[in-house]
Amino acid sequence: IELGLVGSEMCIRDRDAVLPKSESERRALWDIRENFEIITSREPCYLYDVSRPISDMDAYAERVVGDVRRQWPEGECYVFGHVADGNLHLFVTPGVEGDFHSQSDRLVYEPLTQYRGSVSAEHGIGVEKMPWLGHSRTETELALMRSLKQTLDPNSQLNPGRVI
């Protein structure tokens, strides 16, 4: 598996961990994380920001990478993340022309239910992730969110018609 997880102090690739021994090695690891334009230059490329428990990080990433490769043999799924908090950034490139966003969403978001994950780690839910919110929140949690929204914003002035 070509799995690259980059955290603030660790890089995991092909299931091996590398701990930087100097400031220059630490910067080199962060360069991988910050200079991802080469990945997004393959179009289409779909970016995701998910989280799940750290204990499920490897299993979830392996599943999504495998599912992407089965769906698109010419495709790739690159995974970067924060090892210490379970946050992953996935870059899915089907390797063929066309609009495969909804198929890619399904491959990334559906397994989150099994791995007790969230469709968003750092960047909020937003309109695009709204259809998938049920994969990471129970009906009870969604009802509580709606209730809080109604209590705090009874006139729906804050982001009207958006997520909740």
Regions found by a protein language model. Name each.
Residues 9-164:
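Conserved glycine-rich FAD pyrophosphate-binding loop
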Residues 1-7, 11:
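Single conserved hydrophobic/aromatic residue that forms the stacking wall/gate
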